[in-house]
Amino acid sequence: DYEKYMDSIVAIQKRLPDVKLLVLAYENTVEDIGVDRFIEFCLSNNLKDILLVGLKDDIIKNKIIAAGLQVSCYVQFHLPEEEIERAKQSNGFVYLQAKPYETQQINEKYPTLKDGVEYLRSCGIDRPIYCGVGVHAPEDVKLVKDAGGDAAFVGSTILKLHEDIPAMKEKIREFKAMC
């Protein structure tokens, strides 16, 4: 039920007014909610940054951008040209994969995260580049920082500690110390 999901976002926003929330949404979910309803929800709740994934084409993305929201795009570590083009045509931050999967190909021209960030900048992308996927340890945050990334997404490492709040707080401190 998307209504409960949307109500939960508003409740979190009210509980944590100083925390900037990003909305991650799959294009088919936006279609299920209704594009206009989704846009109105984001605008009325000051949720300006949308990470839109699973795009079939640019129609919905362009409609969201035209409404005044910022749409971010994901770029895999091996820097597929079509993903870079999508990022160039968008207006939000770029979500760059920080580390390759074990079986994932690596772009020989840009084998490191630093190379990837520099390449995206050379392509004319001047918006923030947030790096995630593979950021599991505090040292990974330093890797992102040293590569020129503007921020790091840390997910499962923190979420796995949800039942041990003191350990979660300590882990967050460890990550912050590397920023």
Language-model-derived ranges and their functions:
Residues 21-25, 50-52, 71-75, 94-96, ...:
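Hydrophobic faces of well-ordered beta-strands that scaffold small-molecule active sites
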Residues 36-37, 78-89, 131, 135-152:
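Catalytic cores of alpha/beta
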Residues 45-59, 95-105, 145-168:
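Glycine-rich phosphate-binding active-site loops on the catalytic face of alpha/beta enzymes
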Residues 42-48, 64-72, 88-95, 147-151:
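Glycine-enriched alpha-helix->loop->beta-strand junction motifs that scaffold or abut catalytic
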Residues 119-125, 136-179:
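Alpha/beta catalytic cores of nucleotide-metabolism and tRNA/nucleoside-modifying enzymes
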Residues 84-120, 161-164:
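Glycine/Thr-rich beta-alpha phosphate-binding loop at enzyme active sites
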Residues 34-40, 108-116, 168-171:
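Charged helix-capping and loop-helix junction motifs
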Residues 1-55:
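Active-site beta->alpha loop and helix N-cap motifs at the rims of alpha/beta catalytic domains
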